[in-house]
């Protein structure tokens, strides 16, 4: 199985998953990059997976379905183009892989991640929940939901690969360095991120550089407390403070 990022809009990645001469697209913001990829690689579209109902994630799904009407569109009931409604725990297959749907709200009140388990490990298509060195903004969800989604991700094996839908890594790492200026892993990752695409990323890597997965680290909590000017008594409070600090960070 081969997984390829296709660039779309300004900073979106549409993830294309190939098995034989069939492919899945994840979060098609627009149809044309997907169609060009399919033609160039002589592939048939087998499935489309949508994580949440924002135009830069579902905008191309309806057009792709019209072009490939045998191809199901998976998404929650608020995804207009969905032909196959999913909920937490829904399972289906693609190629030799097993797909499990997780509810990972926070960015939006209803947000799904697709966990693809293959012989070479777990691949998580996480939309706008987790970014490398960061997390999604809270729109219609809550920071409590987002924190819980991160806690669940953090229980996966450290070799799990995450496939976010945006390349925000360099900007996120600059904020991470603001929180942990003495973290050598962040400095190394930042230098690399300025030169090349960074995705996908392993959970092991994110545990070293993502402040939103490091809320129990004393240096992270102390820095957050210093910046917000109050005591933070739990991982959730640290997470929420970091999210507010990131919103204001320039």
Swiss-Prot record:
The keyword Metal-binding applies. Zn(2+) 2 binds at residues 56-57, 128, 166. Its EC number is 3.1.2.6. GO terms for molecular function: hydroxyacylglutathione hydrolase activity; metal ion binding. Binds 2 Zn(2+) ions per subunit. Pfam families: HAGH_C, Lactamase_B. Its cofactor is Zn(2+). GO terms for biological process: methylglyoxal catabolic process to D-lactate via S-lactoyl-glutathione. It catalyses: an S-(2-hydroxyacyl)glutathione + H2O = a 2-hydroxy carboxylate + glutathione + H(+). It is an enzyme of class 3 (hydrolase). Pathway: Secondary metabolite metabolism; methylglyoxal degradation; (R)-lactate from methylglyoxal: step 2/2. Keywords: Hydrolase, Metal-binding, Zinc. PANTHER family: HYDROXYACYLGLUTATHIONE HYDROLASE (PTHR43705), HYDROXYACYLGLUTATHIONE HYDROLASE GLOB (PTHR43705:SF1). Belongs to the metallo-beta-lactamase superfamily. Glyoxalase II family. Monomer. This is Hydroxyacylglutathione hydrolase. The gene is gloB.
């Amino acid at each position: 199985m081969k997984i390829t990022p296709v660039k779309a809009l300004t900073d979106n990645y549409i993830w294309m998953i190939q098995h034989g001469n069939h492919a899945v697209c994840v979060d098609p913001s627009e149809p044309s990059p997907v169609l060009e990829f399919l033609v160039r690689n002589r592939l048939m579209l087998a499935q489309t997976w949508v994580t949440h109902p924002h135009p830069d994630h579902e905008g191309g799904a309806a057009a792709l379905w019209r072009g490939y009407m045998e191809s199901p569109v998976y998404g929650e009931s608020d995804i207009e183009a969905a032909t196959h409604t999913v909920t937490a725990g829904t399972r289906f297959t693609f190629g030799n892989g097993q797909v499990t749907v997780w509810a990972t709200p926070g960015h939006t009140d209803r947000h799904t991640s697709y966990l693809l388990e293959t012989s070479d490990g777990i691949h998580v298509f996480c939309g706008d929940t987790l970014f490398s060195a960061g997390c999604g903004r809270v729109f219609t969800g809550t920071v409590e939901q987002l924190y819980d989604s991160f806690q669940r991700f953090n229980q996966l094996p450290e070799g799990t690969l995450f496939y976010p839908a945006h390349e925000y890594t360099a900007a996120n790492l600059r904020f991470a360095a603001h929180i942990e200026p003495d973290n050598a892993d962040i400095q190394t990752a930042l230098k690399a991120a300025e030169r090349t695409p960074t995705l996908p990323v392993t959970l092991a890597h994110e545990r070293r550089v993502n402040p939103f997965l490091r809320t129990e680290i004393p240096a992270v909590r102390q820095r957050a407390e210093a910046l917000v000017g109050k005591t933070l008594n739990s991982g959730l409070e640290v997470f929420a403070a970091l999210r507010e600090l990131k919103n204001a960070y320039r």
